[in-house]
Amino acid sequence: MICTFLRAVQYTEKLHRSSAKRLLLPYIVLNKACLKTEPSLRCGLQYQKKTLRPRCILGVTQKTIWTQGPSPRKAKEDGSKQVSVHRSQRGGTAVPTSQKVKEAGRDFTYLIVVLFGISITGGLFYTIFKELFSSSSPSKIYGRALEKCRSHPEVIGVFGESVKGYGEVTRRGRRQHVRFTEYVKDGLKHTCVKFYIEGSEPGKQGTVYAQVKENPGSGEYDFRYIFVEIESYPRRTIIIEDNRSQDD
């Protein structure tokens, strides 16, 4: 009996061991398979990671590019806005006829004002040139007559060496320009001047009367006469030049 019991126990142990081996065998096989396939899986994962990383970076860069640049809808809207702005600007440049007429009238007015100013300036320059350089100007006649008075011996004997001339004297004592008179006789121009002289001799003063006549041959103006009236005592007249006899 004991022997049979021991044999039964041994048989059950064998059965238990065989069942355990059977249960462990698939696990071991799976483990080996996993160990065999792990490098390939790891390589596959690395390859996938390596291949996926650029895709992710490209995706990110694509996203950043699209976010930085305008969207197609916004580009269309901006283009339509620019076109509308250009059209409005072109439409705004069109000037109505009334505005053109106003601008033309204003330009014509400015032109008239400019021409008027030029004419006035030209007249002033002509007057100044005539007064300073023309032989028929009163200032020129006055200067020539004064030089003849300064060089005349009788005038020097009465008034002294330094003889000076001046025009009319106002109530305030200011000396004005030389008085003159112009007229035309027998088609020839005549100019008469009147001024005053005084010299180094105290209390001596004289009045000068001079007249010029246009010479038809040369166009110059020649003296007809130059007189000096001494106003102090004794009164007398100094004849510096008298050409009136040549008129006959």
Curated annotation (Swiss-Prot):
Transmembrane regions listed in the UniProt entry: 108-128
Lineage: Eukaryota, Metazoa, Chordata, Craniata, Vertebrata
Name of encoding gene: TIMM21
Oligomeric and partner information: Component of the TIM23 complex. Component of the MITRAC (mitochondrial translation regulation assembly intermediate of cytochrome c oxidase complex) complex, the core components of this complex being COA3/MITRAC12 and COX14. Interacts with COA3 and MT-CO1/COX1.
Sequence segments annotated as region (Disordered): 67-98
Signal peptide range in chain numbering: none
Keyword tRNA-binding attributed: no
Domain of life: Eukaryota
GO biological process: intracellular protein transport; mitochondrial cytochrome c oxidase assembly; mitochondrial respiratory chain complex I assembly; protein import into mitochondrial matrix
Transit peptide: 1-18
A GO CC term assigned to this protein in UniProt: mitochondrion
Subcellular localization: Mitochondrion membrane
Gene3D superfamilies on file: Mitochondrial import inner membrane translocase subunit Tim21
Organism expressing this protein natively: Homo sapiens (Human)
Keywords: Membrane, Mitochondrion, Protein transport, Transit peptide, Translocation, Transmembrane, Transmembrane helix, Transport
Pfam entry (one): TIM21
Protein's recorded name: Mitochondrial import inner membrane translocase subunit Tim21
Keyword set includes Membrane: yes
Coiled coil ranges: none
Protein's membrane topology: Single-pass membrane protein
